[in-house]
Amino acid sequence: MKEMNAELVCGILDEIMEYELAGVVRYTHSAMMVSGPYRIPIVAFLKEQAAESLTHAQQAGELIVGLDGHPSQRIAKINETHRHSIKDILEESLEHELHALSLYKKLLGKVADRSIYLEEYARGLIGQEEQHSLELKAMLKDFG
């Protein structure tokens, strides 16, 4: 196995943690703003995404500590578009998931062949983010 740069990996994990924490805020806000006939199932979906983002942030933070790093107390910047139609919310959610996917792929690039545990962690989260992206794309089909 190759040598792993723990400081670099902690930096990426910190970026992931901050982005996932921003996801908690984004999804919670979005859930509050949904209106219309599909409100109930979409609010439930968004609340589930917020809870999952919190879990992902906590996991990343625990890994940072395990690697002798120190998790930040920041969250990533959240862009407020003031567009709150269901289509807009789902499109912004898809954009969020795709960026999260890119962060986990970035992590995978730095831990592959260096740490089996971190490689499997990254692969698992990549799978989850890909699944969420596919779900959102399917939900957006009705909005043409």
Task: Give a label for each model feature.
Residues M1-G144:
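Iron-associated oxidoreductase/ferritin-like identity signal
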